[in-house]
């Protein structure tokens, strides 16, 4: 049982790390050269000064929705980890971790929806930056976090507390 708790906790911490990096780092869309776009800033590399020049992203409604969904997924994942620890130490033997599992399933839905909205609107990014580009590693991390959070939520729902 202690090995299972260790694995579930490690999986949850891995999901948290993936979500933090995916939400806060600067590579949701990479352009040719060293330029990249993220959820918060549009950054370009200035060769003359050897510095990054960043500006706020446009006021697209869909981009604001992706921002909100990714932050919501972080909050829900943190909440589910806190709930798991609370339930682990206060719940009676034989109890199920329904609240933790439900929060983690909501996390997976929020990540899925945010990444899907971003993928659907990739053509708008290409209109603004016609030089091309591709999805960055933060976008890929969001897609990796989705199935992990889904599996984690299902595991939590089926997990019983034993002594």
Curated annotation (Swiss-Prot):
<feature type="glycosylation site" description="N-linked (GlcNAc...) asparagine">
    <location>
        <position position="47"/>
    </location>
</feature>
<dbReference type="GO" id="GO:0032060">
    <property type="term" value="P:bleb assembly"/>
</dbReference>
<feature type="transmembrane region" description="Helical">
    <location>
        <begin position="139"/>
        <end position="159"/>
    </location>
</feature>
<dbReference type="GO" id="GO:0006915">
    <property type="term" value="P:apoptotic process"/>
</dbReference>
<feature type="glycosylation site" description="N-linked (GlcNAc...) asparagine">
    <location>
        <position position="56"/>
    </location>
</feature>
<feature type="transmembrane region" description="Helical">
    <location>
        <begin position="4"/>
        <end position="24"/>
    </location>
</feature>
<dbReference type="InterPro" id="IPR004031">
    <property type="entry name" value="PMP22/EMP/MP20/Claudin"/>
</dbReference>
<dbReference type="Pfam" id="PF00822">
    <property type="entry name" value="PMP22_Claudin"/>
</dbReference>
<keyword id="KW-0812">Transmembrane</keyword>
<dbReference type="InterPro" id="IPR003934">
    <property type="entry name" value="EMP_3"/>
</dbReference>
<dbReference type="InterPro" id="IPR004032">
    <property type="entry name" value="PMP22_EMP_MP20"/>
</dbReference>
<comment type="function">
    <text>Probably involved in cell proliferation and cell-cell interactions.</text>
</comment>
<feature type="transmembrane region" description="Helical">
    <location>
        <begin position="100"/>
        <end position="120"/>
    </location>
</feature>
<dbReference type="InterPro" id="IPR050579">
    <property type="entry name" value="PMP-22/EMP/MP20-like"/>
</dbReference>
<keyword id="KW-1133">Transmembrane helix</keyword>
<keyword id="KW-0325">Glycoprotein</keyword>
<comment type="similarity">
    <text>Belongs to the PMP-22/EMP/MP20 family.</text>
</comment>
<feature type="transmembrane region" description="Helical">
    <location>
        <begin position="66"/>
        <end position="86"/>
    </location>
</feature>
<protein>
    <recommendedName>
        <fullName>Epithelial membrane protein 3</fullName>
    </recommendedName>
</protein>
<dbReference type="GO" id="GO:0005886">
    <property type="term" value="C:plasma membrane"/>
</dbReference>
<keyword id="KW-0472">Membrane</keyword>
């Amino acid at each position: 049982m202690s090995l299972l708790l260790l694995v579930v906790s490690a999986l949850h911490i891995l999901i948290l790390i993936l979500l933090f990096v995916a939400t806060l780092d600067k590579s949701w869309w990479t352009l040719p050269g060293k330029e990249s776009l993220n959820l918060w800033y549009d950054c370009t590399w200035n060769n003359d000064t050897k510095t990054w020049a960043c500006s706020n992203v446009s006021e697209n409604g869909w981009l604001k929705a992706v921002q909100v969904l990714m932050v919501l997924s972080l909050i829900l994942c943190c909440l589910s980890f806190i709930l798991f620890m609370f339930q682990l130490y206060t719940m009676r033997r034989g109890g199920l971790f329904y609240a933790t599992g439900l929060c983690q399933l909501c996390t997976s839905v929020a990540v899925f929806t945010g990444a899907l909205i971003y993928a659907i609107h990739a053509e708008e990014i290409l209109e603004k930056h016609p030089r091309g580009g591709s999805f960055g590693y933060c976008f890929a991390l969001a897609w990796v976090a989705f199935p992990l959070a889904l599996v984690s939520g299902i595991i939590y729902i089926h997990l019983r507390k034993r002594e």
